[in-house]
Amino acid sequence: MKLVVGLGNPEPRYAGTRHNVGFDVLDTLAATFQTRFGKGKGNYLSTKISHRNRSVILLKPMTYMNLSGHAVVAAMNFYKVSESGLLIVCDDLNLPAGSIRLRAKGSAGGQNGLKHIIECLGSEGFARLRVGIRPLDRPLHSFSSFVLGKFTEEERIVMEKVIPVCREAALDVVVNGIEHAMNNYNKPII
């Protein structure tokens, strides 16, 4: 069993924001498998898919980003998924828009959702798929207002190309493992 978690903020006002790109990737995965999210046994929405004879739980925490660890730990306990079966999908302000980076483990790198998951698990030993959101054309003055802001039209065009690649990268992790997916997807997309 694999658990793929997309990070974001639950309220409708955050839909389409840069910080919710993890939710966007999970929504694309669910649509690909023609399934819908329902209320889980914890503070999350989940759905189950099967891909190449592998069971996968897709999960969207319904906590705010900075408290994502509670939902992740609850789901890991309920579904009996170990760290090796966990993949977190989140935005990354340190990566330029149009790029993704898969890692087998590592620090939070300034991403507060990852930071809380690491705190709750007491470990950095889980896979993550980081989706770049840093603008190429302007400096940032306020990180929080930027990540909570909606994508510009130009950024949306880039994300429409990136999100399907993220979907395929996540499925590659499920089937072939994180190392294989890193070799295939850790390169610029745009």
Curated annotation (Swiss-Prot):
**Gene Ontology molecular-function annotations:** peptidyl-tRNA hydrolase activity; tRNA binding
Protein name as catalogued: Peptidyl-tRNA hydrolase
Naturally occurring in which organism (per UniProt): Chlorobium phaeobacteroides (strain DSM 266 / SMG 266 / 2430)
> Short name of one Pfam family for this protein?
Pept_tRNA_hydro
* Key word RNA-binding present: yes
| InterPro entries listed in its UniProt record | Pept_tRNA_hydro, Pept_tRNA_hydro_CS, Pept_tRNA_hydro_sf
**What phylogenetic lineage does the species belong to?**
Bacteria, Pseudomonadati, Chlorobiota, Chlorobiia, Chlorobiales
Catalysed transformations (reactions): an N-acyl-L-alpha-aminoacyl-tRNA + H2O = an N-acyl-L-amino acid + a tRNA + H(+)
Its gene name is pth
Q: Which GO terms describe its biological process?
A: protein quality control for misfolded or incompletely synthesized proteins; rescue of stalled ribosome
Query: What is the disulfide pattern of this chain?
Result: none
Keyword Chaperone present in the record's keywords: the answer is: no
Q: Which GO terms describe its cellular component?
A: cytoplasm
